[in-house]
Amino acid sequence: MSDRQAALDMALKQIEKQFGKGSIMKMGEQAERKVSTVPSGSLSLDVALGVGGYPRGRIIEIYGPESSGKTTVSLHAIAEVQRQGGQAAFIDAEHAMDPVYAQKLGVNIDELLLSQPDTGEQGLEIAEALVRSGAIDIIVIDSVAALVPKAEIEGEMGDSHVGLQARLMSQALRKLSGAINKSKTIAIFINQIREKVGVMFGNPETTPGGRALKFYSTIRLEVRRAEQLKQGNEIVGNKTKVKVVKNKVAPPFRVAEVDIMYGEGISREGEILDMASELDIVQKSGAWYAYNEERLGQGRENAKQFLKENPDIRDEIAFFIREHHGIGEDSAPENMEESTTLD
């Protein structure tokens, strides 16, 4: 053994003695080669994320205009974690959580931990305590803009508090990032949009809370309404685009299109139908949709209703979509015919 190797071994032993076993290791020893994920609750978004869902132990920022579907996207993630037997927490800084709507999206509100903090410091300290416990699988902070520093709440209306929230977020993320990674917690920060004053060229839109969250986030999702969905003259929902603006675990800039139906959340049938039509798993002839020579319905809404009433066929189509994109989370449905294959 060379003197250099002996010196390195001695240094490694001292580091492990001082900071504990596993504090330093060779990258290939115990590091996870494949990113561990939890489904987002939307097949289209799972594909856009490139790894089949939200990566564990990472920070995710979801931002967009008002009523675009940010909280809906987050609640679907909570429902998926709970479906897998995980524990979820929701820091409701906006004090606007609707338990009835959350329940309709599949969230078990009896098991969901909810906090409605008075100040930004309180909300972030509660989040840190939950993450450090190691018992939380997903935590959602709604929203960064509502994490108001204590000094601002206790001050007068006209007082100036320049950069106070940005400093608060910067300090909190420095403390949180390591704990989030070690505990394998998915931390979702919901954020709003503001406009910079006096911007003549380029995008005037920005997100509050400073730049720290942009840097610490593994994934940043931009949620925007694209168009209204109508049934006759009645507006029943919105077609929403979710753009992956930043992604450290897969190629970014992919876009997921989902139907967010009022009172129901993301329409699983709508995205499955659209994706299956693109891949020619479901054949579209005129206004008719067909699968394995079986007609699903005339028009998109009727075909969606057919898939809703026939979950076996819906799950079978979803399996082939996942298989095509290489993000197989679902196993093949038991009643799937062996002859059914994806070309």
UniProtKB/Swiss-Prot annotation:
Q: Name one GO cellular component term.
A: cytosol
Q: Which GO terms describe its molecular function?
A: ATP binding; ATP hydrolysis activity; ATP-dependent DNA damage sensor activity; damaged DNA binding; single-stranded DNA binding
Which key words tag this protein in UniProt?
ATP-binding, Cytoplasm, DNA damage, DNA recombination, DNA repair, DNA-binding, Nucleotide-binding, SOS response
Per the UniProt entry, what are the Gene Ontology biological process annotations, in alphabetical order? DNA recombination; DNA repair; SOS response
SMART domains, A to Z: AAA (SM00382)
The cellular location(s) given in this protein's UniProt record come to:
Cytoplasm
Species of origin reads Bacillus cytotoxicus (strain DSM 22905 / CIP 110041 / 391-98 / NVH 391-98)
Q: HAMAP family, from UniProt?
A: RecA (MF_00268)
Could you tell me which SUPFAM superfamilies the record lists for this protein?
Answer: P-loop containing nucleoside triphosphate hydrolases, RecA protein, C-terminal domain
**Entry superkingdom:** Bacteria
Q: Name one Pfam family in it.
A: RecA
| Annotated function | Can catalyze the hydrolysis of ATP in the presence of single-stranded DNA, the ATP-dependent uptake of single-stranded DNA by duplex DNA, and the ATP-dependent hybridization of homologous single-stranded DNAs. It interacts with LexA causing its activation and leading to its autocatalytic cleavage.
Identify the residues that bind ATP. 64-71
- Mind telling me what this protein is named? Protein RecA
